[in-house]
Amino acid sequence: MNKPPTLETRASGVLLHPTSLPGPYGTGDLGPTAREFVDFLAASAQRWWQMLPVAPIGPGDSPYAAPSAFAGNPLLLSLEEIAKSGLLTKREIKPPRGLAAGRAKFSAAWAFKEPLLRKAFERFSKDANEAERQAFDGFRAGAACWLPDYALFAALKGLNGGKAWSDWDRGLRLRNRAALAGAREAHADEVRFHEFLQFLFDRQWRALRTRANGKGVGLIGD
């Protein structure tokens, strides 16, 4: 097994945001094509993959306009990897015609992925075994310094039609404790859905990083 490079050693690499990878779902993701790109880098004696930010995106689809420095972009979730876990079927993730074009289609990609991610969440909530539930709870505990606030923010952003937080109800935008607690309770399932997305992202990210490091390729953000 090769060792990943260190910043103290001179090495070359390639800059490529994962959404620029080819794929059938409108944008690249952390699935098969990302692994293939890692293999290509290793075979080409490249030691670094500079990925730019992989945080959630907002209006304009810029990775530099993220609502969180800790969360991952759910758009980068690989449906193929989720299907391998049994939460989706191959038939369900079959992409519609037109998504696999030469240019990224962020809105169309999310419009296709989001309902499937919600379906995966519903199945996980109903059918996950004890080991999977413990893994989810362990992730939530390990990310307790940022995940609860991020998941609540993401849930409220969607429930407010994507409006800026400054246009939300006064209690929420001023972070009134009672208002936040009430929102967290009223929208518990939606908050948990966003926690679940980050759980999936963490798993897929770690798997890709392990593969890359095993081939002597390091991952750099920006």
Predicted regions and their residues:
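Acidic/aromatic-lined carbohydrate-recognition and catalytic surfaces
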Residues: 2-221
